[in-house]
Structure formats: C-alpha cells, structure tokens
Amino acid sequence: MKRPARSIILCGIKHCGKSTQGKRLAAALGLDFYDTDDLILEQCGMDARAIYKSQGKDAFMAAELKACEYLRDTLQAKGSQGQEAAAAKCAVIATGGGICQNEPAIAILKKLGTIVYLEVPEITAAGRIVREARFLPDGTIQNLPAYIANKNPADQKEVRAIFHDFYMERTKKYRSLADITVQAQGSRSENTKKILSELGLD
C-alpha cells in the first residue's frame, strides 16, 4: 500500500467516526495516530467537554489550538531525525467536532496535511446523539453536546430540531474547508476503503 506524502487529518461532527477511522487508517498505513481530544485531556487534565462547560468556549478553543501546536512541533521534530524523516512527519490525526470554528487551529492543520471531511447523514448523527443522551423522569436531559444542552431542549423532538440547524451549518463549514469529502455511510471497513481510495492510497 502507498504511503501518504502528508499527514491525514480527519474532521467532521461528533459521532461521524473520526477516531475509529483514524486508528484503522494508521494501522493500515503504518503511521502514528493522534486524537486532538486525547491531547487536550493529557495537556489540561480535563476533557474537552468539561473545559467548554466550566471555562467557556474561548478556553476550549485555546486548549484545542495548543493541541494542534503540539502536533505541529512533534511531527516537525520527528521529520528532522534520521533517514525516515519524511515518513515520520506523516501521521493520522482525528480532530474534535468543533475544529471548523477554530481558524488558528485549522491553519496549522492545513499546513500539516490533507483535510478529510467524514460526512454522515443527519438522521444517523442525530440518532447517535439521542442514544447517548439520558432522558430522566424529571424531564431533564443529560449527556448532550454543549451546543444542544445550552438551548435547554424539553424533549427528544427539540433535541433533533436543534441538531438540524447545527448540522446544516457545520456541513456547509466543513465542506468549504476540506480538501476531500467522504460519504461515511458504509461499514467501518467500507469507509476505510473509501478514504484510502479518495486519497489515492489504495
């Protein structure tokens, strides 16, 4: 199998399969795998959702940018060592669902590699969010993404309505910044093959 000349950066909304596909691609191509959400947890001692909820959007975006700066510096350092420098500079990177709003972070990632947008149907993504949520007897809903929870939905119907507006806005944004858009509607193995094919690595 061919090796990429640049890193592969996976983006898309929550639950589109970025981390799953990232690990599969890294294994198939023999590359290191990084997840910006994991880096945020390692660097800040709390996960991305907790930072957003307790410290706000600006603090979260700063943490996300710091993770991308770490990736840039790490991959550049690897690329300066030994005969396999070019290969070492390449990795597979899964990003957080809101990376499209973080322009400084996107600017770094675009210099590192190819931005691949994993697009899933709205009904699929909404269904995953609803399944993950906890609808309590007192009417409260737990474990929702912040952008939904902040609008205080009363029931599943309102959750889906809020998500619809979000999905349309994010889809437009991701399509505009991505180098490649992949319709990730198949099985895990099918989606991996699609990504490799779109990248010319099959």
Regions found by a protein language model. Give the residues of each.
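ATP-binding Walker
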Residues: 16
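Post-Walker A helix-loop "phosphate-sensing" segment adjacent to the P-loop in P-loop NTPases
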Residues: 27-36
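A glycine- and Lys/Arg-enriched "phosphate-lid" helix/loop adjacent to the NTP-binding pocket
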Residues: 114-171
